[in-house]
């Protein structure tokens, strides 16, 4: 069941989408998505990226975050992106199409980046929503746990993690799990995130 109020197939959703100032700005600047502005706002506060870093981008399609990161880490940096959806090629970005919960896909991902060699793990993964809060939040936390597990395998000491999750039951426990791996944990809600959305972004720094 899809909540018709916010369904991407509804005329109401489409009207709001195309009137959105960030959608308009993304179109004007020829960006792939409005999520570029979310990452920019977070990075202005938390300074996640620097030249030469290796970054994993989970839930990368259509490529808004990958393009942003590329502009920050330069030609000496490296981005490995992964999504179940296709993504148009971005020069300098290695894209892996598949579900990162699939052991075969995660094995390829780990092979590409090496053990404890990644500076930042990003996850903008989101579940298909039902409009039923308890289900949507649970699915979001599940994706957050997948991303956190990838951090445990690939993130170097003092590395950083940025993950999108939905607010609701289970978030407090998830925050505790993130705290167990990182010294600094913050919650961000950038202006480009729609006010009615349950999404928040957890910024975790200084992997233990």
Swiss-Prot record:
The UniProt entry, under InterPro entries, shows: RNA_methyltr_RlmE, RNA_MeTrfase_FtsJ_dom, rRNA-MeTfrase_E, SAM-dependent_MTases_sf
Q: Which reaction does it catalyse?
A: uridine(2552) in 23S rRNA + S-adenosyl-L-methionine = 2'-O-methyluridine(2552) in 23S rRNA + S-adenosyl-L-homocysteine + H(+)
Q: Which residues bind S-adenosyl-L-methionine?
A: 63, 65, 83, 99, 124
The entry lists its GO molecular-function terms as:
rRNA (uridine-2'-O-)-methyltransferase activity
Q: What EC number(s) is this enzyme filed under?
A: 2.1.1.166
Q: Cellular location of this protein? A: Cytoplasm
Return the GO cellular component terms, semicolon-separated: cytoplasm
Where does this protein chiefly localize? cytoplasm
Q: Which UniProt keywords apply?
A: Cytoplasm, Methyltransferase, rRNA processing, S-adenosyl-L-methionine, Transferase
Q: What class of enzyme is it?
A: transferase
Q: Which Pfam families match?
A: FtsJ
What NCBIfam families does this protein map onto?
Answer: PRK11188.1 (NF008390)
**Family (UniProt):** Belongs to the class I-like SAM-binding methyltransferase superfamily. RNA methyltransferase RlmE family.
What the protein does comes down to: Specifically methylates the uridine in position 2552 of 23S rRNA at the 2'-O position of the ribose in the fully assembled 50S ribosomal subunit.
PANTHER family under this entry? RIBOSOMAL RNA METHYLTRANSFERASE, RRNA METHYLTRANSFERASE 2, MITOCHONDRIAL
- The molecule here is called Ribosomal RNA large subunit methyltransferase E
Please name the source species: Blochmanniella pennsylvanica (strain BPEN)
Give the source lineage, highest ranks first.
Answer: Bacteria, Pseudomonadati, Pseudomonadota, Gammaproteobacteria, Enterobacterales
């Amino acid at each position: 069941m899809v909540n018709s109020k916010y369904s991407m197939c509804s005329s109401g959703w489409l009207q709001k989408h195309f009137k959105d100032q960030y959608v308009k700005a993304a179109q004007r600047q020829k960006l792939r998505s409005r999520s570029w502005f979310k990452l920019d706002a977070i990075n202005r506060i938390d300074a996640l990226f620097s030249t030469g870093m290796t970054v994993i981008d989970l839930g990368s399609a259509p490529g808004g975050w990958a393009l942003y990161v590329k502009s920050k880490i330069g030609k000496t940096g490296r981005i490995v992106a992964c999504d179940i959806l296709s993504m148009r090629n971005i020069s300098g970005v290695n894209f892996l199409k598949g579900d990162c919960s699939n052991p075969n896909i995660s094995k390829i991902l780990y092979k590409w980046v090496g053990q404890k060699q990644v500076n930042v793990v990003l996850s903008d993964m989101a579940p298909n929503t039902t409009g039923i809060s308890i289900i949507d939040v649970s699915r979001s936390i599940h994706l957050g746990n997948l991303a956190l597990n990838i951090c445990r395998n690939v993130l170097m000491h003092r590395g950083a993690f940025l993950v999108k999750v939905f607010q609701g039951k289970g978030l407090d426990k998830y925050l505790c799990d993130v705290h167990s791996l990182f010294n600094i944990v913050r919650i961000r809600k950038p202006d480009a995130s729609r006010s009615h959305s349950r999404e928040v972004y957890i910024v975790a720094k200084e992997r233990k």
